[in-house]
Amino acid sequence: MAWHTLGTARTALHITGRRFVDDTARDARNISASLRVFILTVVVSVLMGVAGWAFLLSLRTVTSIREANLWLFALLPLVNVATVWLYHNHGLRASRGNNLVIDSTLTGTHIHARMGLLTFICSTATHLAGGSAGREGAAVQIGGTIASNVGALFKVRGHDRRDLMMAGISAAFGAAFGTPLAGAFFGMEMCFVGKLDYSAGLYCLTGSFIGNAVSRMLGSEFAFQTIPVVPDLSLTTLALVVLAGVAFGAMARLFTLAIRTVKRLYGRLFPNYLVRAAASGAILALLFIGFGLYRYGGLSEWLPGAAVHGQTTLTDAFLKLALTALTVGVGFQGGEVTPLFGIGAALGGWIGTITLGDPGFMAALGMVAMFGSALNVPITTIMLGIDMFGSGAGAYFVIVSFISYLVAGHRALYPAQRIVTPKRRSLKQDVGLTVADVIERHGDPLEELIEGIDPESHGTDSNCDRAAAGTTVEPSEVDPSPTKHYK
């Protein structure tokens, strides 16, 4: 009996020892892999910080040149033709923009290095000619390009590559906007609707803070506003914030619809892509020059500051929205986030003036809420508010973020986003689909109104969204991994 007990104990010790050795070896491999990704994240972040500084410097330079030479708005048709020709003939699917970055993150599709170069050059050209665009889209594409190519160089695969891509996105946001907290969460949240990828948290935090630090160290400057007065928490204030959140979400939905509608109408009117680029650029130039709308060109960074101090009107919000849709919806490169800041701030300033008698507080809420609801990134929105305005209005940022997020629905600027958690339980059938799939499935009342005006245009818009999302491409271009029904 004693010998049997001793034998059993020896066997148990042997098994336990083996498991300990196996667990230790596995932990060592995981630590080694994590350390490798961390080191590569630092490399990507430093490179993105330098690229972000160079990009911001180029935008400041061409903006100064344009403001001193308003005749440059006449170059909009030429710039658009050159841009769409380059992307059509040499872009290697780079025209999908941030949707390609999303798919690359989730499926492992490689991003060719020329995407970053093209978006840098063409976005700068857009701002030189006065197109109403931002900088986030270009920055994220540059960050995604850097991360994808660094990953390919060091043969990073699977989840490690995905973490590196998200870190590159975070580094881009932090470097371009000077908001490291928001940048960290943006990388974890951008690819999904209803999910925050915590597994990439350390890398995204590292990427955003290093990208921001390097960009600032090289000379990038970021101007943030302050909220003059944060109202006390009361039922009246809460009710006004909720109503404002509804307005911001509706405006964000209108913004995304406007861009899709512009794509649809121009695609219907001008089937040839070069003719379409020339015509849309000419119409945009005529609007700027004919109506003297020069200050709405480019980033329009004056809008948030003016809104906080009550120097904007509701007209400013709608003009910036329309001109941005007529810019990014026809082929010009850039981004949408900075225009969203201005649109939301102007709308919020107007709401604040008529409800509280003070535009500053609502302008700040509108600035971040428009961004978050149009891009489906509510947690990033909260962090952006804290980055830009401090934590004093933190509770209000949380409320307005989620209200506007729910009102905006599943429609968003990035058709390739995967829906992981639906915004309402009644939409659970959307889980696993892309935003493009949802737009096609549910439609939109305003889109149906447009179809009533032009019945022959039915389906054009959803096809554009699906093409941007990567769910309808030529057979020879299909990615090796699926791009939809992601869970």
Residues of each region from the PLM?
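Alpha-helical transmembrane segments and immediately membrane-proximal extracytoplasmic
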Residues: M1-K487
